[in-house]
Amino acid sequence: MVPASGSASANAFYSPGVDNGDYVYISGQGPRRPDGSLPGSFSAQVSQTLDNVKTIVEAAGLTMEHVVYTQVYLEDIGKYDEMNSIFGEYFPKAPPARAVLGVARAPQSSIEISAVAVRSLADRRSIYPPNYQHSDSCSPGVLTHDRMFVSSMSGSDPSTGKVPDDPAAQVDLALDRLQAVLKAAGLEMGNMVFVNPYLTSEMPAHVM
């Protein structure tokens, strides 16, 4: 699927989006404008990246409200707050589930975003566990007619934001937070079919 306008273009190895009927899968989009130029500021790059995602979503006949999951890659994780404030502007009604990852290098510039959109909004709902601090930019989970999308869950204490020194305690906290989202949707850990753990060098794989 290729939008009629925008910076996304297909080649032998890449499609901007794939429409399989119930879902539209949007490939990682960078911040280049349709003419190939790159915005100068980071905030402008975030906006252009989301505009590029939006162009593909709309080419499928959908809106940003149909987006249920996004994955954001940042070269400088220190710019998270700046990205986050702009991100929320694109999802004013029902923000998607989301993972934000710090990476050593993105292909085009400092940010890349991939996404999944659902075609029917009939059964789409955001999932919030009890006492969860609401966010304007993402939902802990999004439930559709046939699957659940869960945001990345960090190994920090949800009430204080503190990250334990013990790696095993971080794993427990992340899994507890994941379980709380599933439970709020009426699901259990046994219902999960895919999980993607992200570790830093400070987290031994055998502990996770």
List PLM regions with ranges:
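N-terminal presequence-like segments and the immediate start of the first folded domain
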Residues: M1-D51, T55-Y69, L74-F194, L199-M208
